[in-house]
Amino acid sequence: MRSAIFAAIALTISTALAGPESDSEVAARKAALDLAGAFTNEGFKMRDGHWTGTIKPKEHALIAVNLYAGNQYWFSVGATEPAKKISVNVYDETGKLMETESYSEGDKAAAGFSPTNSGQYYVLVDLVEGDASSVCLVYSYK
């Protein structure tokens, strides 16, 4: 009984904190999904869920992800105006920059990665040029 109450409280708090997405966040998600669509044509499946937020100049968004050896991943990011250029990088749990295939065109960027070890990795989204903007990260795998 007690754990059910705590679970209900935790769900209420997380739902309240999440709140509805702004129009800008929805536009960033659309841009990320448009980019990720190119990878679904190559057999990649979209992972459920996404991450949205605001990124400012000289600040980074760091998102932890669990990846499995033997899979291939594409991390796709879309941003809204006034972002002019964004980048995506992948780091292992020790902070080592991983070698990735990369794509970047203005307010959209992607990084392709195939881990040799399963575990936690970090995706770093960086606003290279422009002012504070909404961004969205989605990823796909095969």
What residue ranges belong to the model's regions?
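Predominantly extracellular/luminal regions of secreted and cell-surface proteins
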Residues: 19-44
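Acidic, Ser/Thr/Pro-rich low-complexity intrinsically disordered segments
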Residues: 20-21, 49-134, 140-142
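Positively charged n-region of N-terminal signal peptides that target proteins for export
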Residues: 1-5
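Hydrophobic h-region of N-terminal signal peptides that target proteins for export
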Residues: 9-18
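Generic detector of short alpha-helix boundary/capping microenvironments
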Residues: 6-7, 31, 46, 63, ...
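Short amphipathic alpha-helical segments, especially helix-boundary/capping motifs
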Residues: 12, 26, 37-39, 48-51, ...
